[in-house]
Amino acid sequence: MTVRAVRGAVQLDSTDRDAILEATAELVTEVMSRNDLTTDDVISVLFTTTPDLTAEFPALAARKIGFHDVPLMCAAEIAVPGAMPRVVRLMAHIETDRPRSAIQHVYLRGAIALRLDIAQ
């Protein structure tokens, strides 16, 4: 097995707690599904949020869907003028037999505009 990183992001419709939890769960579920992963394959996940998302930690959504013993961390993105608002990003470190070219990076909703080069 090789260690790989998987990227992803989702843009939320609002900044409330439920929106953060729902969108983060959707993003994590899609990353896992598209890359044929189980939580045993995940080494760690780093979540970031844009400065306008303060109602909840995105990691809570991952805990609620089964990431009980996976190290998770949340951080704030820097406030860049003109940056896309209401975005949760993730970078998951995983163990996989897939080559780097076969990793499915997941960008949902409006966040697809962030990485047209790798969004699937």
Task: Tell where the protein language model's regions lie, with residue ranges.
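Terminal domain-initiation and capping elements
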Residues: 1-120
